[in-house]
Amino acid sequence: MIEGMYEKLVRPALFKMDPEQAHNLVHKFAPLLAYSPIRFQFTAANLQTNLSGLVLKNPVGLAAGFDKNGNLVKVLDRLGFGFAEIGSVCAEATSGNPRPRLFRLPSDNAVINRLGLNGDGAEAVAQRLAKAKFALPTGLNIAKTNLPDIQGDKAVEDVLKTFDQIKSLPLAYVAFNASCPNTHEGILNERQQLNDIMAEVQKKNVAGLPIFIKMSPDSTEQLITDIVEISQVHGMAGFICGNTTLSRDGLNTDSARVAQIGMGGLSGQPLKSKALNLCRRVAQLKLPTQQIIACGGIATGRDAFEFLRAGAAALQLYTALVYHGPTLVARINQELSVLLQQELVRTEPQLISENSS
């Protein structure tokens, strides 16, 4: 009923608004979820997931980008997530790229954004989170400040400054964003620069926070190999595979409209195959102790199941919420639970029989 209400009433109203205005409106009213008796949740024993030593009630998390500044950490459990990731957080507060910078592609269940890492800055976010009550295990995504003069050694210093601000917070993990396409200098994709950052981070990581590296689905084979090798040298917990893509291949949206929108990272349903391929490749290269959080094009329980079978331990989504609303995560978890049970029956029927007797 609520799902139908969202798709027939709420979504059409939001889609008449500028995408960024709609996003801000949702943020304005989201804190009211704390006072609502409604929880959009589905629980099942076979959904419990271990991520870096934490037991999650389910493997479906909120991707970075929705709660950039940590304003909603006490209500995100109401949407049925097993964990959440806030950010990206940068050392300095920035306004991001000029508007318009967020665009819907309804024919593709996709979004193009070139927000440019707008946010309150690390100090403000850290102060807010120090006083906050986390409703879910919560990770934090760190990115380089989007300013043209922050490059090279300054980029390393910038990222470490953010880590210094947040390293004492009760976080589930920290992710380093090596894959944002909407900033000056693009991504932190130089091997030596990434190596320097990870080495210094682990020196400062006295609390032993699990460290993940967020990778682009557009990464070359060499970059994928470099990142995995660096992660192993410095004891990284794992990888987030992946982020938005610069590719526009296979879209249903009119090509003239896509060209009119211009640059930006594409997220949503068209990203799935690229994210799956990245997940499979990293799964081949990583250490058995390292874990993958998959991100990109996940909108159904079947999608989630495919990523888990590709080597992911947990999953993230964001764009699908825009199109399917607050009941989405519960539906994904319900479908995923059924698929996992069916697989167990198919592969281990004797175990099922013994547990049922």
Set out the residue ranges of the language-model regions:
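Active-site glycine- and acidic-residue-rich loops that bind
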Residues: 146-159, 187, 213-232
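Glycine-rich phosphate-binding active-site loops on the catalytic face of alpha/beta enzymes
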Residues: 82-94, 180, 237-248, 297-298, ...
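Glycine/Thr-rich beta-alpha phosphate-binding loop at enzyme active sites
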Residues: 27, 31-34, 38-42, 178-192, ...
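Catalytic cores of alpha/beta
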Residues: 69-76, 219-233, 284, 298-315
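C-terminal helical cap(s) of enzyme catalytic domains, especially alpha/beta-barrels
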Residues: 93-109, 249-264, 320-345
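A gly/proline- and charged-residue-enriched helix-loop-helix capping module
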Residues: 87-137
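An N-cap/entry alpha-helix motif that binds or orients negatively charged groups
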Residues: 2-49, 113-118, 122-123
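Glycine-rich beta-to-alpha transition loops that act as phosphate-gripper elements at the mouths
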Residues: 64-67, 141-144, 215-221, 291-302
